[in-house]
Swiss-Prot record:
Protein name as annotated: Dystroglycan 1
Family matches, as InterPro entries: Alpha-dystroglycan_domain_2, Alpha_DG1_N2, Cadg, Cadherin-like_sf, DAG1_C, Ig-like_fold, SEA_DG_dom
Region (O-glycosylated at one site): 49-71
Key words of the record: Cell membrane, Cytoplasm, Cytoskeleton, Disulfide bond, Glycoprotein, Membrane, Nucleus, Phosphoprotein, Postsynaptic cell membrane, Secreted, Signal, Synapse, Transmembrane, Transmembrane helix
Domain Peptidase S72 as annotated: residue spans: 603-712
MF GO annotations: actin binding; alpha-actinin binding; calcium ion binding; dystroglycan binding; laminin-1 binding; protein-containing complex binding; SH2 domain binding; structural constituent of muscle
Residues carrying a glycan: N141, T317, T319, T379, N641, N649, N661
Signal sequence residues: 1-29
O-glycosylated at seven sites with GalNAc, as annotated region: 463-485
């Protein structure tokens, strides 16, 4: 009876305890598959003993907000304002850092006063950066209690990103950016200021402050400026058509190029007023404003970046294969981004992926395979969620998958769906990669180290495969695992390296040293990875290696191509870069080297000439010695950039070397700068200074130096210095010291050979023309020999018998010769003896009306001729009295 009473008292107590434990077990078993809103449902159903635990969990659940993703371009300023109303903060401490880390990327700066995130990325910062923004409440014990959190991404594009797109991304006024954009393939005129600064040593705030100071100085908008470091010591642009010096006498740091756009296709005549840059840069005003020395400035036309040439190679068409897996459970996609909590798995919605289009088969409705491995143990998840990106042509995959960060340059994985299988994507390669990874309890896409990956079903006629995919998981942040997609590396045959980015074209100038570092993303090999892990070889056509005496050389260890062309190499040259992996397979990239004429031509303001001891033949025939000479000459002037020296000529007379300095402006004559350079390397009498001698020894020993003006300074002589009594303007530009009679140059050849020959030829031509004119004038009016033969005899003409008319006797000279058709003369006029009043004097106006002949009067007397003259008329045109009568020649009687 007592036991029955005790049992009746214990039954209600055990019943309530058993019911409570049963509810907790059911809640734990259903928690992983329910959405996060189940917290509020279970809060109303559980007992008061668990209410405090769920209350703490509800307070720790962050509020997900949407901060839009951003884009940045290498060398251009980036700025984004974090909206505090989206975070929901009211007096909390806002913390901004890289997702999963405690600090920001090296190129970003957070300003807590203005709530702005700004920076300037460099070439090493390309890729996607995930930024976490969280607000924390300060506790009484000094610790920070998280209140809200959000994650957004910033994708950094390379420097040669599309200019209009980059301008639109950075410019607040889209209409202004569109109006200022140049036409397609139209060169953009850019003004560049060279600073003696190192961007890699600057903090993000110092870079932005430098741009702000230049903005206030030049009144150029911040989004139009570009700030990049100097690459390969190329401080100056050889294609610049205008340039000027700065106040820096010596370059110490690596150098920075600060540039902005002036217009489209401008030249020296149409460029806008640049006096606001030219004078301040030379006088030091710009340097004082910016806080860094100014080396110089130049203006050049930049051609817009053209899209890379796409190889039209037909790849093997993949065959989709349906993989049969275990039963799957389709989980509905939640409408919002869910941040993992200490007791719930993370479910990340897909976002947009910037990936190139592919030709892979698009799978149907994919589902995620979920495998249950016993009881699920809840472990706290550290670090915020990181969003993933899915291409526009891809599919939306649902499931308990944690977002991953894809390393830039590698292929981004996709969640596996069955059926059918998905494909792993890589740029410009159509390759199916079936695989079936499963999601474990930590909800990541990485496999456990002890799990053997599943071998996919072989796919026929597939000759290209995707490169290895590296993934950095976000949970836990202190341990990063790498995984590969597809078949394990040990079971695959060696793959041929692939060409990813073409070298395309290299520009070089006559007499100017150039060097090109082969980018690491030019080739890619599945086993050996990037280009710097491959063996590169430079070859000509038909697998012919570049010789030791070629003007182009290649260092396979440093993967550096360099050279020094001369005037005989002007034009286009084709070369082939071979990349070979450790297995012996290789890939080839064909590119061209365009050699242009000297950038300054004959307009250089000064010519430097030095005489060295030795024979010039070994220097002329050895490209390595010529390059060493150019480098030593640049070092003697204090320039680390060897492209500032343009080699003009190497002639006999020991070793006579001529060169110009590309840093000198063409107009007006930079007399002060040339004088400074002259005093740096030589004395006034032409002897080299010790600094110049030490810079070139022991390979080259200088004996004398001469510096003469040319171009805008053609009337000046710098070294040796002209005597004070003779003005420097009377010195001809070709005059050189007479210490060495064997010295010669192009000017001497023209002066002593070409010009005299042309003058003599012109004089001879003019003399010949004058002689011909005089001869023709003297011969004018003279008969030819044939005409002279006709009138050579002045005798009586010969008349033949048949030509003589015997019917009429020859006329006699005593009687007048009257023709047969003649008539008798008219009778003489009648002269009345008395004066008639009607008669009009002959001197009157009517003299023309007097008619002496009266043919109409029949009674008129005959004409009476006037009496002959008694005295001969001696006057002009009178005949002689006695005239010899005409005698006919005797008739011709033939023999």
């Amino acid at each position: 009876m007592r036991m029955s009473v005790g049992l009746s008292l214990l039954l209600p107590l055990w019943g309530r305890t058993f019911l409570l434990l049963l509810c907790v077990a059911v809640a734990q078993s259903h928690w992983p598959s329910e959405p996060s809103e189940a917290v509020r449902d279970w809060e109303n159903q559980l007992e008061a003993s668990m209410h405090s635990v769920l209350s703490d969990l509800h307070e720790a659940l962050p509020t997900v907000v949407g901060i839009p993703d951003g884009t940045a371009v290498v060398g251009r300023s980036f700025r984004v304002t974090i909206p505090t109303d989206l975070i929901g903060s009211s007096g909390e401490v806002i913390k901004v850092s890289t997702a999963g880390k405690e600090v920001l990327p090296s190129w970003l700066h957070w300003d807590p006063q203005s709530h702005t995130l700004e920076g300037l990325p460099l070439d090493t910062d390309k890729g996607v950066h995930y930024i976490s923004v969280s607000a924390a409440q300060l506790d009484a014990n000094g610790s920070h209690i998280p209140q809200t959190s959000s994650v957004f991404s910033i994708e950094v594009y390379p420097e040669d990103h599309s200019e209009p797109q980059s301008v639109r991304a950075a410019s607040p006024d889209l209409g202004e950016a569109a109006a200022s954009a140049c036409a397609a393939e139209e060169p953009v005129t850019v003004l560049t200021v060279i600073l003696d600064a190192d961007l890699t040593k600057m903090t993000p705030k110092q870079r932005i402050d430098l741009l702000h100071r230049m903005q206030s100085f030049s009144e150029v908008e911040l989004h139009n400026m570009k700030l990049v470091p100097v690459v390969n010591n190329r401080l100056f642009d050889m294609s610049a058509f205008m340039a000027g010096p700065g106040n820096a006498k010596k370059v110490v740091e690596n150098g920075a190029l600060l540039s902005w756009k002036l217009g489209c296709s401008l030249n020296q005549n149409s460029v806008p007023d640049i006096r606001g840059v030219e004078a301040p840069a030379r006088e030091g005003t710009m340097s004082a404003q910016l806080g860094y020395p100014v080396v110089g400035w130049h203006i050049a036309n930049k051609k817009p970046p053209l899209p890379k040439r796409i190889r039209r190679q037909i790849h093997a068409t993949p065959t989709p294969v349906t993989a049969i897996g275990p039963p799957t459970t389709a989980i509905q996609e939640p409408p919002s981004r869910i941040v993992p909590t200490p007791t719930s798995p993370a479910i990340a919605p897909p976002t947009e992926t910037m990936a190139p289009p592919v030709r892979d088969p698009v799978p149907g409705k994919p589902t995620v395979t979920t495998r249950t491995r016993g009881a699920i143990i809840q472990t706290p998840t550290l670090g915020p969620i990181q969003p993933t990106r899915v291409s526009d042509a891809g599919t939306v995959v649902s499931g308990q998958i944690r977002a991953t960060v894809t390393i830039p340059g590698y292929v981004e994985p996709t969640a596996v769906a069955t059926p059918p299988t998905t494909t792993t994507k890589k740029p410009r390669v159509s390759t199916p990669k079936p695989a079936t990874p499963s999601t474990d309890s930590s909800a990541t896409t990485t496999r456990r180290p002890t799990k053997k990956p599943r071998t996919p079903r072989p796919v026929p006629r597939v000759t290209t495969k995707a490169p290895i995919t590296r993934l950095e998981t976000a949970s836990p942040p202190t341990r990063i695992r790498t995984t590969t997609s597809g078949v394990p590396r040990g079971g695959e045959p060696n793959q041929r390296p692939e060409l990813k980015n073409h070298i395309d074209r290299v520009d070089a100038w006559v007499g100017t040293y150039f060097e090109v570092k082969i980018p690491s993303d030019t080739f890619y090999d599945k086993e050996d990875t990037t280009t710097d892990k491959l063996k590169l070889t430079l070859k000509l056509r038909e697998q012919q290696l570049v010789g030791e005496k070629s003007w182009v050389q290649f260092n396979s260890n440093s993967q550096l191509m360099y050279g020094l062309p001369d005037s005989s190499h002007v034009g286009k040259h084709e070369y082939f870069m071979h990349a070979t992996d450790k297995g012996g397979l290789s890939a080839v990239d064909a590119f061209e080297i365009h050699v242009h004429k000297r950038p300054q031509g004959d307009k250089a303001p000064a010519r430097f000439k030095a005489k060295f001891v030795g024979d010039p033949a070994p220097v002329v025939n050895d490209i390595h010695k010529k390059i060493a000479l150019v480098k030593k000459l640049a070092f003697a002037f204090g320039d680390r950039n060897c492209s500032t020296v343009t080699l003009q000529n190497i002639t006999r007379g020991s070793i006579v070397v001529e060169w110009t300095n590309n840093t000198l402006p063409l107009e007006p004559c930079p007399k002060e700068q040339i004088t400074g350079l002259s005093r740096r390397i030589a004395e006034d009498n032409g002897q080299p200074r010790p600094a110049f001698t030490n810079a070139l020894e022991p390979d080259f020993k200088a004996t004398s130096i001469a510096i003469t003006g040319s171009g805008s300074c053609r009337h000046l002589q710098f070294i040796p210095v002209a005597p004070p009594g003779i003005p420097s303007s009377v010195t001809p530009p070709t005059e050189v010291p007479d210490r060495d009679p064997e010295k010669s140059s192009e000017d001497d050849v023209y002066l002593h050979t070409v010009i005299p020959a042309v003058v003599v030829a012109a004089i001879l031509l003019i003399a010949g023309i004058i002689a011909m004119i005089c001869y023709r004038k003297k011969r004018k009016g003279k008969l030819t020999l044939e005409d002279q033969a006709t009138f050579i005899k002045k005798g009586v003409p010969i008349i033949f018998a048949d030509e003589l008319d015997d019917s009429k006797p020859p006329p006699s000279s005593s009687m007048p010769l009257i023709l047969q058709e003649e008539k008798a003369p008219l009778p003489p006029p009648e002269y009345p003896s008395q004066s008639v009043p009607e008669t009009t004097p002959l001197n009157q106006d009517t003299v023309g009306e007097y008619t002496p002949l009266r043919d109409e009067d029949p009674n008129a007397p005959p004409y009476q001729p006037p009496p002959p003259f008694t005295a001969p008329m001696e006057g002009k045109g009178s005949r002689p009295k006695n005239m010899t009568p005409y005698r006919s020649p005797p008739p011709y009687v033939p023999p």
